[in-house]
A protein has these predicted regions:
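Noncatalytic scaffold domains of N-terminal-nucleophile
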Residues: 1-27, 33-200, 204-206, 211-256, ...
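Short, well-structured alpha-helical segments that form the helix of a local strand-helix-strand
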Residues: 36-43, 129-141, 212-214, 278-295, ...
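Active-site rim segments in enzyme catalytic domains, especially the processed small/beta chain
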Residues: 48-65, 70-73, 223-225, 355-420, ...
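Short beta-strand scaffold segments in enzyme catalytic cores
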Residues: 54-66, 345-349, 409-411, 501-509, ...
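Short, small/polar residue-rich loop motifs at catalytic or cofactor-binding pockets
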Residues: 236, 341-344, 405-407
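Glycine-rich phosphate/pyrophosphate-binding beta-alpha loops
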Residues: 250-258, 344-348, 360-372, 423-431
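Internal maturation/activation junctions in enzymes
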Residues: 270-363, 375-376, 383
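Extended C-terminal subregions enriched in glycine
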Residues: 353, 401, 434, 443-498
Length: 530
């Protein structure tokens, strides 16, 4: 963990996986801006400098709290296209990439404006969207240094992206893979951002930019129409919560997997988790087994507008206690479970007045669908691939429906006031990483920097491994590997601080309002205090 990735004892802070993005947010905080304003500045730069994980062709999920501890969630999730069913064959999986996966609209830009409206109304925010995205426009137009992460994901997908002509034109200039630190320009994306700055966020959905987007998407066979874009709106909803020791954990509700994170922590709570030590085989085993119980119930989560199911019942105390009792301290549960893909970015900010925002922004898979919408420079997400084509599945495709969502930024309150902001990249890995981080922070008293630097794992299939193994970073130690194997875990050692283990960030607020925080050493990011 480098000094550049950590920050200590400040009144305000921003964290993200990109140093340039964090610097944009920190400038807003120095100028007296709110946490939401700082996050919008940070998020817009990430849409330029971290295009492999997020962009304005994707979605965003927010958790916000004022300094009194009033927590809300903003679901910036695009809905299924009205004519999307015309491209689906029942029983045949939706394509993971390409036009067939572009079945949902994109809500990131609307979420920025929605959050800014909240900031202006409730937090005294004065900054507008146009000024906040100006740094992003400048970087897209004038160029920025390509990150190691972007180069890694270009190289990792080089065989796939060779089949994405419009994508290749944008991201492999002159037909070659760029190298780390090379200056990269996104002129078409700059023009799209300029339109948003000039005409407002709704130009993306109802104006000239919407026309360009639909023209580009329809040219490759996407069913998304301008009418679909016009219906896309961010929703303010109540967060779900769980008491854990002396804090209350908050997460976004269905259709996100925020409930999976809370279920995991609820099972750990019922197990009396403080009886085991940090970093031991017991620690890893019990967290893994709690995650398995949560994931076995997670697949019923879907858009609450399309079901009468009360998903908060998943947090029933008796059920969590029963799951905890079912866990053997010496034997691992077999694990055949489908993997959900996804890559995203976590960013968060706390301002000098105590207001907080914890956000995940994503195009679903790394590089989304691989489809660039015409000459807009916008990579469209492939979130439509999260739907099922089985009409009896809770997450079956339906026009206007929100897909099951892996994004679940978190927040913890202590004494009724914001105490932790946290989140991670990693699809199925999100609840897993968060459970390890939260136990390290809350049960074992580690600092944000130390909690992030410690070894982590990823359970089940991944984009690079079709086996249902437990991938554990090698620095967990030989004794831990041996003990876990003896309990029946099928293990695969992965490198220290592996990309498979996600990129997380944490901001911690003490009772006097001072903050410390860090971004993951597995990322290119930085926490900046003000």
């Amino acid at each position: 963990m480098t000094d550049q990735q950590t920050a200590f004892k400040h009144r305000a802070m921003v964290t993200s996986p990109s140093t340039a993005a964090s610097e944009a947010g920190a400038k807003v905080l120095r100028d007296g801006g709110t946490a939401i304003e700082a996050v919008v500045a940070t998020a817009s730069v990430l849409a330029v400098t971290y295009p492999h994980f997020c962009g304005i062709g994707g979605d965003a999920v927010w958790m916000v709290s004022d300094n009194t501890g009033k927590v809300q969630s903003f679901l910036g999730i695009g809905q299924a296209a009205e004519k999307g069913g015309d491209t689906i064959t029942p029983g045949t999986p939706i394509p993971l990439r390409g036009p067939g996966s572009t079945l949902t609209t994109a809500c990131t830009v609307d979420s920025w404006q929605h959050a800014l409206d909240h900031s202006a109304k409730n937090w005294g925010g004065t900054k507008n969207l146009s000024e906040l995205i100006t740094p992003a426009i400048a970087l897209a137009e004038n160029g920025f240094a390509i990150s190691p992460s972007q180069c890694f994901w270009l190289d990792f997908r080089k065989e796939e992206i060779a089949n994405w002509p419009s994508f290749m034109d944008v991201f492999t200039p002159n037909g070659r893979m760029p190298h780390v630190g090379e200056t990269f320009h996104q002129p078409h994306l700059a023009q799209s951002l300029k339109r948003i700055a000039e005409f407002g966020a709704r130009d993306f959905y109802e104006g000239g930019l919407a026309d360009q987007i639909v023209k580009g998407l329809s040219a490759v066979g996407s069913p998304i129409t301008k009418a679909d874009l016009a219906k896309t709106r961010t929703r303010t909803v109540d967060a779900v919560s769980l008491d854990y020791g002396d804090v209350t954990l908050f997460a976004p509700p269905a259709p996100t997997q925020g409930l999976a994170t809370l279920m995991t922590m609820g099972v750990l709570r019922e197990m009396g988790q403080k009886n085991w030590a940090e970093g031991t085989a017991d620690h890893y085993h019990l967290v893994v087994e709690a995650i398995k119980r949560a994931f076995l119930k997670r697949d019923q989560i879907a858009d609450p507008d399309f079901t009468s199911t009360d998903f908060t019942a998943l947090l029933d105390h008796a059920d969590l206690a029963a799951d905890a009792k079912d866990i053997s301290p010496t034997n691992a549960l077999d694990w055949p479970h489908p993997f959900r893909h996804g890559d995203t970015v976590f960013l968060a900010a706390k301002d000098a007045n105590g207001n907080c925002a914890s956000v995940l922004q994503s195009t679903y898979f790394d590089w989304g669908s691989g489809v660039v919408a015409g000459d807009t420079g916008i990579v469209w997400q492939n979130r439509g691939a999260a739907f099922s084509t089985d009409p009896n599945h809770p997450n079956a495709f339906a026009p206007g429906k929100l897909p099951f969502y892996t994004l679940n930024p978190g927040m913890a309150l202590k004494g009724g006031k914001p105490h932790l902001l946290y989140g991670t990249q990693g699809a199925d890995g999100q609840p897993q990483t968060l459970a390890m981080l939260l136990t390290r922070l809350l049960d074992f008293g580690l600092s944000p920097a130390d909690a992030l630097a410690k070894p982590r794992f990823l359970l089940g299939k991944t984009f690079s491994d079709a086996n249902d193994s437990l991938k554990l970073e090698v620095d967990a130690g030989d004794d831990v590997f041996d003990e876990l194997a003896a309990r029946g875990h099928v293990l695969r050692a992965i490198e220290q601080q592996s990309a498979l283990a996600g990129q997380a960030g944490i901001i911690r607020i003490d009772e006097d309002g001072f903050v410390d925080g860090a971004h993951d050493p597995r990322s290119d990011g930085k926490a900046i205090g003000v």
